[in-house]
UniProtKB/Swiss-Prot annotation:
EC number: 2.7.7.49
Keyword Hydrolase listed: yes
PANTHER family for the chain: REVERSE TRANSCRIPTASES (PTHR19446)
CDD domains on file: RT_nLTR_like
Residue spans crossing the bilayer: none
Name of the protein in its database record: Retrovirus-related Pol polyprotein from type-1 retrotransposable element R2
Assigned keywords, A-Z: Endonuclease, Hydrolase, Nuclease, Nucleotidyltransferase, RNA-directed DNA polymerase, Transferase, Transposable element
Stored InterPro entries: DNA/RNA_pol_sf, RT_dom
Cited SUPFAM superfamilies: DNA/RNA polymerases
Amino acid sequence: VSVPPTSYRDRIMNALEESMIDVDAIRGSSARELVEIGKVALLNQPMDEGRIMSWLSDRFPDTQKPKGPIYSKTTIYHGTNKQKRKQRYALVQSLYKKDISAAARVVLDENDKIATKIPPVRHMFDYWKDVFATGGGSAATNINRAPPAPHMETLWDPVSLIEIKSARASNEKGAGPDGVTPRSWNALDDRYKRLLYNIFVFYGRVPSPIKGSRTVFTPKIEGGPDPGVFRPLSICSVILREFNKILARRFVSCYTYDERQTAYLPIDGVCINVSMLTAIIAEAKRLRKELHIAILDLVKAFNSVYHSALIDAITEAGCPPGVVDYIADMYNNVITEMQFEGKCELASILAGVYQGDPLSGPLFTLAYEKALRALNNEGRFDIADVRVNASAYSDDGLLLAMTVIGLQHNLDKFGETLAKIGLRINSRKSKTVSLVPSGREKKMKIVSNRRLLLKASELKPLTISDLWKYLGVVYTTSGPEVAKVSMDDDLSKLTKGPLKPQQRIHLLKTFVIPKHLNRLVLSRTTATGLCKMDLLIRKYVRRWLRLPGDVPVAFLYAPVKAGGKGIPCLKQWIPLMRFLRLNKAKRTGGDRIAAVLNCQLYASISHSCKTGPVSVGLWRSTNTGGLSAYWRRILIGMVDGKDLKSAQNHSSATSFNSIRMNDISGEDYIHYNQLRTNSIPTRKRTARGRPNKPTACRAGCDKLKRLQHDIQGCIRSQGGLVQRHDRVVDLLFDECETKGYAAEKVVHLRTSEELWKPDLVLKKNGRVVVVDAQVVQCGRLESDHRVKVSKYRDDPELADVIREKYAVQEVTFEACTLSYKGIWSKNSVEGLQKLGISNYCLFKIVTSVLRGSWLNWVRFNNVTTVVHW
């Protein structure tokens, strides 16, 4: 191990001492033990791996070794069809609380019913052992020492608390071979982590047990008897993953990658590469310039790159010796535990990077850069004064040239350089496209007789009828194909799946639509196609919520905080996202990308994206916030949506839409949405467009039978009003008692003129707060709140009676005011929050009011009382 410079050594020693002081302040045997391990480093003694692992075992005593997924078995349901449906419902609901992604896979992929075809376990292990054992020499030998580049010196600095907080892994991720879960590791005090990581930085390595991994295999497609269709995923210890994530972020910020490589960078690399390819094809056709493209596929790239090539790459990049030594140690004598179908076997890894480790991507692309730098500029395509000869996103590469000879020369160079670092082009899956101008017809034609060779193998030339895919976008030989996306199958599975209605909407927004979003944004789309998808989505959502067809469309598209469902309107959302992503690509992709994306094609695309939303009245909005504001304005401007105008006063009014509030039944969720949208079939509503239909109240009231009258004003619903009101008071009473108030319900306070009966009297710290609850109509929330507060506050004698009875000087009055649709008065909710009422209590009040309002409507229809005037 190389000796670091004195200045660097002083920095790490100072950081170790500071970390030890912070940990020592925690106190306890665990803190003292880790401080002692740090003192060993300060004394320049070798790393005591056993002591570090013993400390970790004491901190995480209940770890269980993961076993990996099992594909050959399906979930077995027993009994009648009804019992099987109940069992599947129980499974999905249980998964939904633990891992929403797993629940989504059960519903959308039906992996609980269909077993994946797999090869025999022995065949699987033997195949991947051979793949892992094919390497290009040890990572720790023949390291070419070089002085670090000045801009890379901070790469091996001591770890800070801020970096640790920002690098935390998701709690839902899997544990490594040590069994330490991300949830338990995230619960550990960051001061412990800082000292431990700085010990790693000081020694330039991690303990050998930590750098091990377990490898699970996931099918790339539906599976099959061939082990090659499975993708190995190496899961390291969460301790190593978090440390490597910090290093990866430092590396990306310090090193300037070749601008032709766009993966693992803080830019939209997929959009940049797809947009560049589309622009190049369009410019070649517009200017009738010859264009030849090679679409290259590599054979198991991440499993084949030589470890020695990784070390050479980081050394040439000017990384500090500490980083070079750390990477060399991490990839030296690597052992992984292969896990498949409940069986385990150890294997040595002599090539490849850890797939799943945050540092693997930056390391791989750094080695891949060597092949990009070997390309000759003579084989290139000129667009907007920019010479483009290649484009890459991780291992997905393209070579471009204006002549076949130039492309063939670069293809040879590229293949030779890749072979030196352990990578090989798959000639069977790689393709070529040749566009040649036809002078007589003034058009571009596809030529399939221009042969390109990779060593002795010929790359497949595409014809005019062939389709090919690049980064998820389907291309024809003339550019991106019009996106053919069908959501009908996924929506049908959501409908039939054992889900609550709110879960269906959540999966629609977080899984089904995002599944197709990238392709819709980056491919060509038509307004008709997007409208058809919007119609299909609306049809299913109305079915899930049992909403009539005349419910405002804005209710589905308005944001959740405004009282809507927050479902994106694809006709507007897709052009807007395309415009935003193109602009971001121009800003972050560098001058070369910006020049290419300023061509005529993208000028027209940007113009059409901006004018599309303008045509529906978005005030020339070019952000998602403007789109949300537009739909909110439409919603509250309609008869069935105007009552939601104040929904934004507090999040508890709409938080029943949140998937975290999983205790709401599906039936109640449907009723709440029917209330919010006036979708309950009252006489007044069903008479829309039927002028001769009677609309008077069936109870004989001299009123129109509106929803508001049925729930709030009819004689049939008076008993329900009292029960709903009492439920609100009970919730407030229980909450105030937990907050330390001495609470009393329905206190009788007599003045000279009147007997007052406030719902709650709260006493705490020499102060009394009088709270009265009311559930009112939707249109006058703030004025009704002021009237209620003024009713108590404007009687000076009442305050004196309270002071005398409770022996306090300070008396204040508050009102709990919300509408029968569960919408809060802004002043009311602010006053309740000042009393310490929690958001959860406010949410429970909202759902209690909504449920009470629904039961009031049910009561109205069940009661037969008639008033005779």
